[in-house]
Amino acid sequence: LPICDIPALLTAAVGYEFLPTLRATLEYHHFFDKAAGMANDKQKALKHGTHEILIGAEWDIAKQLTISGGYQRTDYGLADDFQSDISFSCDSYSLGFGAAIKMTKHLTMNIAYFWTNYDDYTKKISETTKNVYSRTNKVFGLGVDYKF
């Protein structure tokens, strides 16, 4: 593949409506990170491009209320030479939950909570020294949809 600074993305998805009120989707994403041009060619250190698997579902509990939930697993193919104190990544899994509340014919309020748990990545510096890269992410969202 040619080198570019933004990786190409391959996506496949399938959705199914089990009932008129219950839907689910399964997705796979592959980012061609090893073919992207990064600073100091650090993409060459990756074991493979990024793999993501996602699953989600929506349930219309009532005419005015829809709830949803989802899961995402991300595997970056990390290696020690890819990680630095300035820029690092960690494999992760995420869980999200949300609700859409239909306020009027034209106005819907959306509320969501999203939590990402990152795997610790340990980079061996020497026989006695190591760096552990770690983080977590929790997001709360609130929004409105207006249909004209």
Q: Which residues are covered by each model-predicted region?
A:
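Residues that define the transmembrane beta-barrel architecture of outer-membrane proteins
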Residues: I6-L10, G49-I53, D91-L95, T136-F140
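Residue-level signature of outer-membrane beta-barrel architecture
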Residues: Y16-F18, W59, I101, Y146
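Repeated loop/turn-to-beta-strand initiation elements of outer-membrane beta-barrel proteins
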Residues: T21-L26, Q64-I67, I101-I111
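Transmembrane beta-barrel strands of outer-membrane/channel proteins
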Residues: L26-H30, G69-R73, F97, I111-W115
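Outer-membrane beta-barrel "beta-signal"
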Residues: A99-I101, Y113, R135-F148
